[in-house]
């Protein structure tokens, strides 16, 4: 037992050293002084559509002192960024993580963040500013509820080809993107892996390694017909003599039928139960079937591997650039590092520690809202006691027309919102 104790101590020390050696490139918890580290962009200020950020813990939280930054104005563009020492992830794991809470029942707006490279004029940072990585949730209507993972390669933005659903409730969630030197990646939500794979297969960063041989031709004797008619199956004798319809033997000539005036009476016809339709031989498996022919794959002459496909050599800024129809998205605990374990630890210490208390605060807020709404709603007895007269009817018609107008305006606004979102 005594011999085991030093070994156990050694393992603990090794673990502590590993954590201590984790390189934290950028970590922001939005405590006091955060405004000195972040630059608010002047993008969209000239046309008065730039939104203001609010430093707050939100309307419900697990800790009122644990604040982030929140969008505060509807129908606004938001842009803010922070600089960190230039960093390359060559031969290192890149971890990009942050938390976001959509308090506003978000129906159209982004919740993603960006990593930028090179030199950027932060005062002009906006939708047209080139970025290296864009990652995080995006919601717009019923069709878009996903996690973006967009990588820039050779000055082109490439979207992930896999679908990664995002969270859509009004609570805080942690989004993590991990990019490794072996060109593999993982996407986590609340410390749970939701997607993983390779840069080679899940983005179209490079031409495919293999392509179909354009010179290949299908052999003339290649049989793609899976089923054939049974040559042993023969049509029964007299099959074609079976009529499709037969006289209805149960029908009787009407008593008032006059052959001289009405003509000779004939019984109506009914479908013949013995009629089987056009005869066709039964189908059997084709013994010569070879399957659907496909051209063989060959090496793509246009493919050139890039061993540094995963590398972003001059990462220098992290930013938020959003369009929001309804404001209320709150961002916090932004992390850029090279150690997934440290990122998990940070998420556990922040989101994990407070999520139950936040859920309780949210439930309490919802309960209060329901109580307030029930107080404002007219009692049924009061509604029944109200006199019904012509003037009341006119008012009702006016209110109905007003509501119809609001509905039309709302539909038109939703269409405009979706259009603005798609243009981002």
Swiss-Prot record:
<keyword id="KW-0677">Repeat</keyword>
<dbReference type="GO" id="GO:0051082">
    <property type="term" value="F:unfolded protein binding"/>
</dbReference>
<keyword id="KW-0597">Phosphoprotein</keyword>
<feature type="compositionally biased region" description="Acidic residues">
    <location>
        <begin position="221"/>
        <end position="230"/>
    </location>
</feature>
<feature type="binding site">
    <location>
        <position position="112"/>
    </location>
    <ligand>
        <name>an alpha-D-glucoside</name>
    </ligand>
</feature>
<dbReference type="InterPro" id="IPR018124">
    <property type="entry name" value="Calret/calnex_CS"/>
</dbReference>
<dbReference type="GO" id="GO:0005783">
    <property type="term" value="C:endoplasmic reticulum"/>
</dbReference>
<keyword id="KW-0106">Calcium</keyword>
<keyword id="KW-0732">Signal</keyword>
<feature type="repeat" description="1-3">
    <location>
        <begin position="230"/>
        <end position="241"/>
    </location>
</feature>
<dbReference type="InterPro" id="IPR001580">
    <property type="entry name" value="Calret/calnex"/>
</dbReference>
<dbReference type="GO" id="GO:0006457">
    <property type="term" value="P:protein folding"/>
</dbReference>
<keyword id="KW-0862">Zinc</keyword>
<dbReference type="GO" id="GO:0005788">
    <property type="term" value="C:endoplasmic reticulum lumen"/>
</dbReference>
<feature type="region of interest" description="4 X approximate repeats">
    <location>
        <begin position="194"/>
        <end position="259"/>
    </location>
</feature>
<feature type="compositionally biased region" description="Acidic residues">
    <location>
        <begin position="379"/>
        <end position="397"/>
    </location>
</feature>
<feature type="repeat" description="1-2">
    <location>
        <begin position="213"/>
        <end position="224"/>
    </location>
</feature>
<keyword id="KW-0479">Metal-binding</keyword>
<comment type="similarity">
    <text>Belongs to the calreticulin family.</text>
</comment>
<feature type="short sequence motif" description="Prevents secretion from ER">
    <location>
        <begin position="421"/>
        <end position="424"/>
    </location>
</feature>
<keyword id="KW-0325">Glycoprotein</keyword>
<feature type="binding site">
    <location>
        <position position="114"/>
    </location>
    <ligand>
        <name>an alpha-D-glucoside</name>
    </ligand>
</feature>
<protein>
    <recommendedName>
        <fullName>Calreticulin-2</fullName>
    </recommendedName>
</protein>
<dbReference type="InterPro" id="IPR009033">
    <property type="entry name" value="Calreticulin/calnexin_P_dom_sf"/>
</dbReference>
<feature type="modified residue" description="Phosphoserine">
    <location>
        <position position="396"/>
    </location>
</feature>
<dbReference type="GO" id="GO:0005576">
    <property type="term" value="C:extracellular region"/>
</dbReference>
<feature type="signal peptide">
    <location>
        <begin position="1"/>
        <end position="22"/>
    </location>
</feature>
<dbReference type="GO" id="GO:0000325">
    <property type="term" value="C:plant-type vacuole"/>
</dbReference>
<feature type="repeat" description="2-1">
    <location>
        <begin position="263"/>
        <end position="273"/>
    </location>
</feature>
<feature type="modified residue" description="Phosphoserine">
    <location>
        <position position="381"/>
    </location>
</feature>
<dbReference type="InterPro" id="IPR009169">
    <property type="entry name" value="Calreticulin"/>
</dbReference>
<dbReference type="GO" id="GO:0034976">
    <property type="term" value="P:response to endoplasmic reticulum stress"/>
</dbReference>
<feature type="glycosylation site" description="N-linked (GlcNAc...) asparagine">
    <location>
        <position position="59"/>
    </location>
</feature>
<dbReference type="GO" id="GO:0030246">
    <property type="term" value="F:carbohydrate binding"/>
</dbReference>
<feature type="disulfide bond">
    <location>
        <begin position="108"/>
        <end position="140"/>
    </location>
</feature>
<keyword id="KW-0256">Endoplasmic reticulum</keyword>
<feature type="compositionally biased region" description="Basic and acidic residues">
    <location>
        <begin position="210"/>
        <end position="220"/>
    </location>
</feature>
<comment type="function">
    <text>Molecular calcium-binding chaperone promoting folding, oligomeric assembly and quality control in the ER via the calreticulin/calnexin cycle. This lectin may interact transiently with almost all of the monoglucosylated glycoproteins that are synthesized in the ER.</text>
</comment>
<feature type="repeat" description="2-3">
    <location>
        <begin position="291"/>
        <end position="301"/>
    </location>
</feature>
<dbReference type="Pfam" id="PF00262">
    <property type="entry name" value="Calreticulin"/>
</dbReference>
<feature type="binding site">
    <location>
        <position position="131"/>
    </location>
    <ligand>
        <name>an alpha-D-glucoside</name>
    </ligand>
</feature>
<feature type="region of interest" description="3 X approximate repeats">
    <location>
        <begin position="263"/>
        <end position="301"/>
    </location>
</feature>
């Amino acid at each position: 037992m005594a011999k085991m104790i030093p070994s156990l101590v050694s393992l603990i020390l090794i673990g502590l050293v590993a954590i201590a050696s984790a390189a934290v490139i950028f970590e922001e918890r939005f405590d006091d002084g955060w405004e000195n580290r972040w630059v608010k962009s002047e993008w969209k200020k000239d046309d008065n559509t730039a939104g203001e950020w609010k430093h707050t813990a939100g309307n419900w939280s697990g800790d009122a002192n644990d604040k982030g930054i929140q969008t505060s104005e509807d129908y606004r563009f938001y842009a803010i960024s922070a600089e960190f020492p230039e960093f390359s992830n060559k031969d290192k794991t890149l971890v990009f993580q942050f938390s976001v809470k959509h308090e506003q029942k978000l129906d159209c707006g982004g919740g993603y963040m960006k990593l930028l490279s090179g030199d950027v004029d932060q005062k002009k940072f906006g939708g047209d500013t080139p970025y290296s990585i864009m990652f995080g949730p995006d919601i717009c209507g019923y069709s878009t509820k996903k996690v973006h993972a967009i990588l820039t390669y050779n000055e082109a933005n490439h979207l992930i080809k896999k679908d990664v659903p995002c969270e859509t409730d009004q609570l805080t969630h942690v989004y993590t993107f991990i990019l490794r030197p072996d060109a593999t990646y993982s996407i986590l939500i609340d410390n749970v892996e939701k997607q993983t794979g390779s840069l080679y297969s899940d983005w179209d960063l490079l031409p495919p390694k293999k392509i179909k041989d354009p010179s290949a031709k299908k052999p003339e004797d290649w049989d793609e017909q899976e089923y054939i008619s049974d040559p042993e199956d023969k049509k029964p004798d007299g099959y074609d003599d079976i009529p499709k319809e037969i006289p209805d033997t149960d029908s009787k000539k009407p008593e008032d039928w006059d052959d001289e005036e009405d003509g000779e009476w004939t019984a109506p016809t009914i479908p013949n139960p013995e009629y089987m339709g056009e005869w066709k031989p039964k189908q059997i498996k084709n013994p010569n079937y070879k399957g659907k022919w496909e051209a063989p794959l060959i090496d793509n002459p246009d493919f050139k591997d890039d061993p540094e496909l995963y590398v972003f050599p001059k990462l220098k800024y992290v930013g938020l650039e959003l369009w929001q129809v309804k404001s209320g998205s709150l961002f916090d605990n932004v992390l850029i590092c090279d150690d997934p374990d440290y990122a998990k630890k940070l998420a556990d210490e922040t989101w994990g520690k407070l999520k139950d208390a936040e859920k309780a605060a949210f439930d309490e807020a919802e309960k209060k809202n329901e109580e307030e709404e029930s107080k404002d709603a007219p009692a049924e007895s009061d509604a029944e006691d109200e006199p019904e007269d012509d003037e009341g009817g006119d008012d009702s018609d006016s209110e109905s027309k007003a509501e119809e107008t609001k509905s039309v305006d709302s539909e038109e606004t939703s269409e405009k919102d979706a259009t603005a979102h798609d243009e981002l």
